[in-house]
């Protein structure tokens, strides 16, 4: 990854970013199914070349108004391949082998402004126009964003936000290839997979920054996720990323902060979530499903001692039954804790952490839709305990680093 940036004294920033990604792998598989044995091996490599160019101009005007506008252009060449060979003869299996060059271009132009109207009201607005072109698919989309904050009186805050954006599939998910997970399960690529758009509206009321109640509506046309399908012509299950017609989410959320003396403080969050998933073209088992779920989350900090400085934390998470397309998801919960000692000069820290200490975050998925039946239980031991010793030398401060965008990389 190579990055070059320019920052001017008059608000102009410009730059470029080049990324080369290569992930070769070799897999051997022996399939024993219905008295038939087949040995396969395949070589694959995900090779990505991505260029990003951008320019942005920011104007700070009198009265606290800021205006910005800019352009961002991304081009990607995907030179990935996968070659299957018979494990005994070494002969190439052309039906399952692919070597493709896939090109993708994205142009994003945007403008935005922010202003504070006195001490009670502030607003931010922006509009992005995005062009996406890949493999014969060509589309323009507009994505507006509005954020407002109103404080009618001390301790009372009203927030409204409308956001919109686009999400792209991982590059490997777009390859027209098949990977064998085991003798029964297969992972199929989907070259027809489309990006999804997301539109979200939030309304929140905060009281003294300690209590909050809010509502959210989230609409995602062309939402994509991996779903299973049991093939009718042979004993196998294919797992493939597919586009829904849409996914909708209505959420009611509350938050409360609490404090017990000077040694315990925490927050608790409660969510009521109504889900609506629809896919009218999912093989021969189209679905239009609804589900109400409850999510609870809490974080707590305990000052166990001031001299010596010892702090403990306890966090908990719970989610009731939920759905994901044709899947039914079991309830899950997670309890994690930590203990931290800090030296009087603040240079030394000793931290002991325990994650999912009751091993209750394993999810069971159940498929019972149409003629499809499947139940998968996760029996992994997710418990982990870590010990950390940290020492800060002199006045060292960690430098800020820009993370490489890897969301679409990997398999």
Spell out what each predicted region is.
Residues 1-144, 151-155, 211-214, 248-272, ...:
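Face-selective signature of the C-terminal outer-membrane beta-barrel domain
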Residues 166-215, 219-220, 237-251, 259, ...:
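Outer-membrane beta-barrel signature, preferentially recognizing the C-terminal barrel domain
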Residues 1, 15-17, 23-34, 80-90, ...:
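Outer-membrane beta-barrel translocator domains and adjoining extracellular loop/strand segments
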Residues 6, 16-22, 73-79, 127-135, ...:
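Transmembrane beta-strands of outer-membrane beta-barrel pores
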Residues 343-411:
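C-terminal beta-signal and adjacent terminal beta-strands/loops
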Residues 47-51, 101-107, 138-142, 195-201, ...:
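Residues that define the transmembrane beta-barrel architecture of outer-membrane proteins
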Residues 245-319:
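Gram-negative outer-membrane beta-barrel transporters
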Residues 297-342, 355-358, 366-370:
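C-terminal beta-barrel architecture of Gram-negative outer-membrane proteins
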């Amino acid at each position: 990854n190579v990055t070059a940036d320019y920052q001017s004294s008059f608000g102009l920033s410009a730059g470029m970013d080049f990324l080369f990604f290569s992930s070769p792998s070799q897999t051997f598989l022996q399939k024993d199914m219905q008295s038939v044995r087949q040995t396969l091996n395949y070589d694959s490599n995900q090779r990505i070349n991505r260029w990003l160019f951008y320019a942005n101009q920011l104007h700070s005007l009198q009265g606290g108004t800021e205006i910005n506008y800019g352009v961002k252009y991304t081009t990607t060449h995907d030179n990935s391949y996968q070659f299957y060979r018979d494990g005994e003869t070494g002969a190439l299996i052309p039906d399952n082998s692919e070597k493709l060059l896939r090109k993708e271009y994205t142009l994003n132009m945007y403008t935005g402004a922010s202003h504070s109207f006195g001490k009670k009201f502030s607003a931010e607005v922006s509009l992005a126009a995005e062009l996406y072109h890949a493999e014969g698919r060509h589309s323009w989309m507009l994505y507006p964003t509005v954020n407002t904050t109103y404080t009618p009186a001390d301790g009372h805050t009203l927030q409204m936000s409308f956001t919109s954006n686009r999400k792209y599939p991982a590059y490997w998910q777009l390859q027209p290839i098949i990977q064998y997970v085991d003798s029964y399960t297969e992972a199929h690529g989907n070259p027809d997979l489309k990006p999804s758009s997301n539109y979200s509206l939030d309304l929140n009321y905060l009281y003294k920054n300690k209590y909050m109640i809010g509502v959210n509506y989230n609409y995602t046309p062309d939402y994509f996720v991996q779903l299973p399908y049991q093939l009718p012509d042979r004993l196998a299950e294919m797992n493939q990323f597919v586009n829904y017609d849409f996914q909708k989410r209505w959420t009611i959320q509350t938050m409360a902060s609490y404090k017990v003396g000077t040694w315990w403080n925490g927050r608790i969050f409660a969510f009521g979530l109504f889900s609506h998933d629809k896919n009218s073209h999912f093989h021969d088992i189209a679905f239009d499903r609804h589900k109400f779920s409850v999510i609870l989350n809490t974080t707590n900090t305990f000052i166990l001692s001031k001299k010596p400085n010892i702090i403990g934390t306890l966090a908990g998470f719970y989610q009731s039954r939920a759905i994901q397309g044709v899947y039914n998801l079991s309830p899950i919960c997670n309890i994690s804790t930590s203990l931290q000692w800090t030296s009087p000069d603040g240079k030394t820290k000793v931290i002991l952490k325990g994650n999912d200490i009751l091993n209750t975050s394993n999810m069971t998925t159940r498929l019972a839709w149409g003629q499809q039946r499947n139940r998968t239980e996760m029996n992994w031991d997710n418990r982990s305990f870590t010990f950390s010793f940290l020492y800060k030398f002199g006045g060292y401060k960690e430098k800020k680093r820009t993370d490489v965008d890897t969301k679409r990389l990997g398999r």
